From Swiss-Prot:
Protein name: Crossover junction endodeoxyribonuclease RuvC
Cofactor needs: Mg(2+)
Organism of origin: Burkholderia mallei (strain ATCC 23344)
EC assignment: 3.1.21.10
Alphabetical list of Pfam families matching this protein: RuvC (PF02075)
Gene transcribed to yield this protein: ruvC
Length: 180
């Protein structure tokens, strides 16, 4: 199964594509969709078009996207929600089922700790997908979203989803940190 993960943002929307076979995760692609400095409709159109292009290029079976959190600034929350909506429209018009997860669910599922830092997310994603380096923060969150969805959005450590992948690398998670 191929999963497209999306980390929505108005300026930068992260994406990550993985293949899943049982507990095996394989990296396919990741990156960002950058919007131009332009009016809001143009930026939303860029996100929609970018997601549509990703679907054509990578032919995913399913998609996962981060839920919007309420920010201190209501205007920022509204803009993020609109960017997320443009991405969801692209996913749905591409025929994909879309799952939604909170940032807390994402971090809990991938790192094993709901308050994990960006750096911990990047490190865990790199290790789980056997990447030579850490992906950028937006791409790491999007890849993490795909990983989270691959394992049903649950806490992978307690379900054994992440444990086999880490054990093969001589690692485990303890108090939100990789040890090995």
């Amino acid at each position: 199964m191929r999963i497209l993960g999306i980390d929505p943002g108005l300026r930068v929307t992260g994406f990550g594509v993985i293949d899943v076979s049982g507990h095996q995760l394989a990296y396919v692609a990741s990156g960002v969709i950058k919007t131009p400095t332009a009016d809001l409709p143009t930026r939303l159109g860029t996100i929609y078009d970018g997601v549509s292009t990703l679907i054509r290029e990578h032919t995913p079976d399913q998609a996962a996207i981060e839920k919007v959190f309420v920010n201190v600034n209501p205007q920022s929350t509204l803009l993020l929600g609109q960017a997320r909506g443009a991405a969801i429209c692209g996913l749905v018009s591409g025929g994909l089922p879309v799952a939604e997860y909170t940032a807390l669910q994402l971090k809990q599922a991938v790192v094993g700790y709901g308050r994990a830092t960006k750096e911990q997310m990047q490190e865990m994603v790199a290790r789980l997908l056997s990447l030579s380096g850490r992906p950028g923060t937006d791409a790491a969150d999007a890849l993490g979203m795909a990983i989270c969805h691959a394992h049903g959005g649950n806490t992978l450590n307690t379900l054994g989803g992440i444990a086999p992948a880490l054990a093969k690398k001589g690692l485990r998670v303890r108090r939100g940190r990789l040890v090995g």
